[in-house]
């Protein structure tokens, strides 16, 4: 009981520390965030690579604000695994995000080095490198002026894209019942191009780097049910601090359910089922607390996760939620 109380206190203190972050000014940079980020922590922290004793392959799709034309649509495929007999994890992911005529596609390779500690505690230090393609599809612009001839010099008559590198860093500390992560998955700012010039579409501004802090605990309700509260905060020095709180419950028969709330005043319901401890499927429904937004601000998300058994490694890293 004392151990579980210590875990709860650690989680509360971490959450309060995170909420004390203060920032100013809104940033124009968009951030992709899945409703149930626990389905793919690799997307926000490269140190999560190889944090399970098995290889994990994940696929997810998120459709935001279903009642609004040009609303964000995101998809991701990722895989990560530990290397046998080495304190190393590797991973890779490819994702896409579409908002109106703006398209972003990214590919990243991940590496994590694990420092094993007593009592199954692990500190992972991660790095990722990849390429991000930004595209503006001017060909999809629809005009409602019958006199428009398409000769407006301010609107290009062709799609414009640019590809540039990006890098990320992260740290991930875990125990069998607690985890705490800190990361900056994109150290550079890949901007949408106005012209085909690589040098003008990549920047480094420390104040615009988005930092992520996530923490969670695993609590035994009884011999069959576990609760997993977790919190995620993300911000740059030039933006406000956003947070998301998730509370999920899981049963030993593979069923899971829960909900979440995020600072932009959105709530969600999460459900899932795991087949034979290998294949898992989850669905999330999100909506706004604002009555004026409820009709067209609903979002849907689905994830598939598949676990592939590996040869037992001498290096352990517990699995969370």
Show the residue positions of the predicted features.
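Bacterial Sec-dependent N-terminal signal peptides
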Residues: 1-31, 247, 308-310, 320-321
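Subset of outer-membrane beta-barrel
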Residues: 29-321
């Amino acid at each position: 009981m004392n151990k579980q109380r210590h875990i709860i206190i650690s989680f509360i203190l971490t959450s309060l520390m995170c909420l004390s972050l203060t920032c100013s000014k809104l940033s124009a940079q968009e951030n992709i965030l899945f409703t149930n980020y626990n389905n793919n922590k690799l997307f926000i922290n490269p140190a999560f690579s190889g944090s399970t004793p098995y290889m994990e392959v994940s696929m997810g799709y998120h459709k935001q604000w279903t009642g609004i034309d040009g609303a964000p649509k995101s998809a991701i495929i990722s895989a990560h695994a530990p290397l046998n007999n080495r304190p190393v994890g590797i991973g890779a992911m490819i994702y896409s995000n579409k908002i109106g005529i703006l398209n972003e596609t990214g590919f990243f390779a991940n590496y994590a080095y694990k420092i094993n500690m007593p009592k199954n505690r692990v500190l992972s230090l991660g790095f990722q490198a990849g390429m991000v393609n930004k595209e503006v599809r001017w060909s999809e612009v629809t005009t409602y002026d019958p006199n428009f001839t398409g000769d407006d010099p301010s609107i290009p008559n062709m799609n414009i894209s640019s590809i540039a590198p990006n890098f990320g860093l992260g740290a991930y500390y875990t125990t069998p019942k607690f985890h705490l992560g800190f990361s900056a998955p994109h150290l550079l700012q890949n901007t949408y191009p106005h012209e085909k010039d690589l040098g003008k579409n990549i920047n480094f501004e420390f104040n615009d780097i988005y930092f992520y802090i996530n923490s969670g605990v695993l609590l035994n309700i009884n011999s069959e049910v576990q609760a997993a509260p977790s919190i995620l905060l993300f911000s740059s020095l030039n933006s406000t601090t956003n947070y998301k709180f998730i509370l999920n419950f899981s049963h030993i028969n593979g069923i899971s359910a829960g909900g979440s709330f995020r600072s932009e005043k959105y709530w969600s319901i999460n459900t899932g089922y795991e087949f034979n401890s290998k294949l898992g499927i989850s669905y999330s429904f999100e909506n706004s607390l604002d009555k004026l937004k409820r009709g067209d601000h609903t979002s849907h998300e689905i994830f598939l996760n598949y676990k592939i058994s590996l040869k037992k490694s001498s290096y352990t890293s517990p699995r969370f939620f």
